[in-house]
């Protein structure tokens, strides 16, 4: 726009400026909450309690899905919060970078790899039987994200360790069992060790009309492992470079490959959801939205 145009249109831009300001304000207050996902409420001490019923898969599908993601802040001040392509059996640039860092033989590089390692998540449908801190959730079907500790408890129900224990499918309407989620704060992290299954019983007293009503509310789990919902390798590598900076990624990708080519690549163990503090989890949930807006 020329100076003459600016002069001629003086005063007429105020409405555009007001609209832009209002748009900015509204974007700052918009919700980042996915109402489909149930999250436990904890008190000031970090303790919480709820009773859940794990629900079966829809149309004969497995009742849970597993995926990995990465969540870390780079030296640029930007966040990298993206699903890992390893969730769908593909090579992921962060995984490649972490392997190179780990193989560099430099301890500080290993520390970087640890802070950037994968986070493991499971997702399933649950019916909230009891939620004392948020009773409005009771009687509703939600998606529930959890980590390895809770998954191990589910697996142990289906594959008991001792011969005198009967296997229980916790996802079964008629022969499953309620799950008593007990959360404690142990050294700043959420601990689920006290959580346990109740004795097996028929869900909702086995009333078929109610069971069918719950079944019809099941959320689709395939979105979490649908390749269409994952960025491409090149898109992720571009984002990674932006977050870590050109120098950081360039240095890591030029480790002496001729020396390391035939060396075994040690796996960097994924961090589970339980190994994150509740504050870290909430922070990453918020910044994941901001990270997407930066792209």
Feature map (PLM): residue ranges:
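Compact mixed alphabeta submodule
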Residues: 130-260
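Prokaryotic Sec-type signal peptides and long signal-anchor helices
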Residues: 7, 207, 290-291
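Surface-exposed polar/charged interaction patches
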Residues: 20, 24, 246, 290-293
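Charge-rich, solvent-exposed alpha-helical interaction surfaces
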Residues: 17-20, 239, 243, 286
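Acidic, proline-/serine-/threonine-rich low-complexity intrinsically disordered repeat tracts
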Residues: 255-277
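OB-fold ssDNA-binding interfaces and closely related basic DNA-contact patches used
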Residues: 1-170
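Short acidic, low-complexity intrinsically disordered linear motifs used
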Residues: 275-295
């Amino acid at each position: 726009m020329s100076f003459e145009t600016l002069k001629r249109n003086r005063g007429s831009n105020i409405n555009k400026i007001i609209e832009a300001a209002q748009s900015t304000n509204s974007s700052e207050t918009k919700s980042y909450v996915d109402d489909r996902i149930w999250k436990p409420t904890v008190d000031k001490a970090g303790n919480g309690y709820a009773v859940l019923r794990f629900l079966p898969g829809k149309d004969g599908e497995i009742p849970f899905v597993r995926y990995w993601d990465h969540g870390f802040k780079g030296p640029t001040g930007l966040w990298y919060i993206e699903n890992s392509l390893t969730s769908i059996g593909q090579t992921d640039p962060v995984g490649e970078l972490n392997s190179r860092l780990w193989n560099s033989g430099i301890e500080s590089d290993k520390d970087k790899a640890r802070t950037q390692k994968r986070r493991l998540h499971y997702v399933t449908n649950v019916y909230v039987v009891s939620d004392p801190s948020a009773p409005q959730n009771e009687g509703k079907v939600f998606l529930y994200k959890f980590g390895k500790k809770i998954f191990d408890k589910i697996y142990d129900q289906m594959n008991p360790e001792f011969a005198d224990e009967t296997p229980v499918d916790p996802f079964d309407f008629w022969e499953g069992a309620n799950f008593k989620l007990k959360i404690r704060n142990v050294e700043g992290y959420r601990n689920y060790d006290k959580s346990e299954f109740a004795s097996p019983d028929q869900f909702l007293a086995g009333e078929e009309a109610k069971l069918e009503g719950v079944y019809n509310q099941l959320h689709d789990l395939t979105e979490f492992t649908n390749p269409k919902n994952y960025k491409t390798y090149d898109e992720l590598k571009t984002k990674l470079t932006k977050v870590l900076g050109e120098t950081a990624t360039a240095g890591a990708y030029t480790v002496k490959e001729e020396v390391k080519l035939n060396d075994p690549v040690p796996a960097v163990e994924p961090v589970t959801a339980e190994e994150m503090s509740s504050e870290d989890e909430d922070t990453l949930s918020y910044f994941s939205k901001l990270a997407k807006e930066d792209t």
